[in-house]
Every structure is written in C-alpha cells, then in structure tokens.
Amino acid sequence: MTDSPVLALAKDLISRQSVTPEDAGCQDLMIERLKALGFEIEVMVFEDTTNFWARRGNEAPLFAFAGHTDVVPAGKLEQWDTPPFEPTIIDGYLHGRGAADMKGSLAAMVVAVERFIAEHPDHKGSIGFLITSDEEGPFINGTVRVVEALMERGENIDMCIVGEPSSTEIVGDVVKNGRRGSITGDLTVKGTQGHVAYPHLANNPVHASLLAIHELATTEWDKGNDYFPPTSFQIPNVSAGTGASNVIPGEFNVQFNLRFSTELNNDTIVQRVTETLDKHDLNYDLHWTFNGDPFLTDTGALLDAVVAAVAEVNNTKPALLTTGGTSDGRFIARMGGQVVELGPVNATIHKVNECVKVDDLEKLTDMYENTLKHLLAK
C-alpha cells in the first residue's frame, strides 16, 4: 500500500538525524516542495543554526506556518522498540524521534499548503513558512534571529500557526492561544567561609538567605486572569559548601525561575525580587536570563479560523489553553500579530518510542488546510 503524501513526507523527515542544531537536510526537503509551489526562499544561517523563510505572495494578510526541524537526542537506543531514526508503523502509529515534535506537523503543513494552492492558486494574501533547526536547544540563532531580520525590513507576520504538539488526548482537542513568560534568576549570596566550630568568625550565606528565599517562594506575584494561572516561582537548583561537614560555605547559589502571566513583565519582576533581597540586607550578585514574554491571542480572525477548522474535522471545538512551557511563538508574537499553536498529541514527546497516530497526521493536514481556506480562499 502506498503511503499518503503526509505520511511519506513525515517518514522522510524522521529518517534524518537532525539533533539540535543539525538540520540534516530536512529543510532542503521542504524547500524543494515549496519552490514547486512558487514560494520565494530565503535561507538564513546564523552560527551553527540553519533557518529558512519562504513566502508566496506580496499582499496582506501574511499568514505563516512556523516550526522546527531539530529534535532532542534519542537517548539510550536500547530502550527504543525500534531505531529512533528509522520511521516504523506499529498498530497505526508512526514511531520515530520527532514524529510528534514536530516533523509530523511539518509534513502536514507542507501537504496542506500543496492541496490549498492546487484549489486556490490565486488565493488572497500571502503564505509564509518560518522554519528553524534551533528550537530544542539554546534558541538564540533560530526563530528569534529570523524574526529580527524580518522586522528590520518591515515584513511582519499577521497570523501564525506554530506546529507544536498542543493536543492531549486527540489531535486538535487543545489549541494553545498563548503562553506564559519565563525569566530565570541566578543568585549568588556572599558570606565568609569558616570553621563550623567558630561561627562567630564566619558569615553563613545560607542562613542569611533563608528568610529572603522563603519570602520569594511564598509571594503572591499576581492572581492570574481569565487566560493565565497565577505566576509560579520555583527553585530548580541550589548549591553551597565544599562538601566537607566542618566548613561554613562562603557562597550560596540559588537558581530560580518564574513563569508569569500577562499581569507581570520582566521589569516588574526584577524590581520586586531586588527589593526583597535588599530588604534582607544581603550581599549578592544576581544575573537574569529573559527567556520570553507572555503572549495571548484572545480574539481575531486566526483564532476563529482555527477553531472552525478543528471543529469541521473533530465535530467539536478545541479547548483554548495557555498551559505548558515556552515555544517559539513568543518570538513571533513580538511582531504584533496573532499566534496560536496547533499540533499532534504530546503524550510521547521527548520520550523513548515517540510516536504519532497515522490518522492524526491526516486530520492535522485537514485542519491546516481548512484554516487556510477560512483565511485566504477567494
């Protein structure tokens, strides 16, 4: 039996070992298909990262699909039931690293556009593709750099679907219409090292910090809103001491992260954390990493089109959620357009035996094509 177009392309993409930041020829596959449809292609290589921007048309609105060809490492190969880069179908599921995150989505995007253009060669507006090989890694030379380049020349995306695996039980049951912001603080509290038997000759930075850290951890940063839960403060890493039980440490290192709603911004968080630390009279250094602002698409033509497109396939509307981690949608949202995420079921992403239901690839392709019809068909 011959594979369907979306399954064949998904297999071809999965077979390429594109572990971040490698692309391994995945983008060339997509570019070849898009060139045949009349897309203008711009390859953008930044450091070790391969990206491309493709566009068909010069009119507004500019609708784009966004995604990544890179995947996380496979891990221990002996834990996989099948080789991770040899796409295999078992009981109706396509297995392989990247099947759900997110080579299945990429295949669905390309095939959906092929079908749409075949029916609507003179469609309204413009269609774009923003594809990177640096989403699973440090995300410094990928989508963010392409967005910066586009914005510098005034080429802003009006509407964008990011193909991240948004679904939970069945494909399309959840559409992410926003994401929380993320900011990380690396705090070093300085004390004076000494012998534990002579605490009066030392200054223990762990003891000095505990009240301040407790206050930060128990602060109500906000109450959230209709779209976002309250901001979360979490401490993932702490370290101090030499490993010896008789030495008071000279430094105490605390790393913390806040996932924040649209009720806050980076500047407000920095100010409130600094005020808390200063109130406790600590001697400290604090380095911030700004991972991304929150974004929200609560209304608009894109959201209406995606909800309708999903309902036409599933006979039920998707839930609109902002849960989960960050995505490249946060960079695209800087352009001021509407951004949502729609992709496969996320139950196996980043795990051994990652897989996607073959039928879900067909449904996702239909959802993407229906969205294009709602937005750009004449």
From Swiss-Prot:
Gene3D superfamilies xref list: Zn peptidases
EC primary class: hydrolase
Catalytic activity: N-succinyl-(2S,6S)-2,6-diaminopimelate + H2O = (2S,6S)-2,6-diaminopimelate + succinate
BP GO annotations: diaminopimelate biosynthetic process; L-arginine biosynthetic process; lysine biosynthetic process via diaminopimelate
Swiss-Prot/TrEMBL keywords: Amino-acid biosynthesis, Cobalt, Diaminopimelate biosynthesis, Hydrolase, Lysine biosynthesis, Metal-binding, Zinc
Active site: D70, E135
This enzyme's EC code(s): 3.5.1.18
Gene Ontology molecular functions: acetylornithine deacetylase activity; cobalt ion binding; succinyl-diaminopimelate desuccinylase activity; zinc ion binding
Entry keyword annotation includes tRNA-binding: no
Residues the record lists as binding Zn(2+) 1: H68, D101, E164
PROSITE patterns, sorted: ARGE_DAPE_CPG2_2 (PS00759)
Positions contributing to Zn(2+) 2 binding: D101, E136, H350
Associated pathway: Amino-acid biosynthesis; L-lysine biosynthesis via DAP pathway; LL-2,6-diaminopimelate from (S)-tetrahydrodipicolinate (succinylase route): step 3/3
InterPro entries: ArgE/DapE_CS (IPR001261), Bact_exopeptidase_dim_dom (IPR036264), DapE_proteobac (IPR005941), Peptidase_M20 (IPR002933), Peptidase_M20_dimer (IPR011650), Peptidase_M20A (IPR050072)
Cofactor note: Binds 2 Zn(2+) or Co(2+) ions per subunit.
Cofactor dependence: Zn(2+); Co(2+)
Pfam families named among the record's database cross-references: M20_dimer, Peptidase_M20
Subunit organization: Homodimer.
Role, per record: Catalyzes the hydrolysis of N-succinyl-L,L-diaminopimelic acid (SDAP), forming succinate and LL-2,6-diaminopimelate (DAP), an intermediate involved in the bacterial biosynthesis of lysine and meso-diaminopimelic acid, an essential component of bacterial cell walls.
Family: Belongs to the peptidase M20A family. DapE subfamily.
Name of the protein in its database record: Succinyl-diaminopimelate desuccinylase
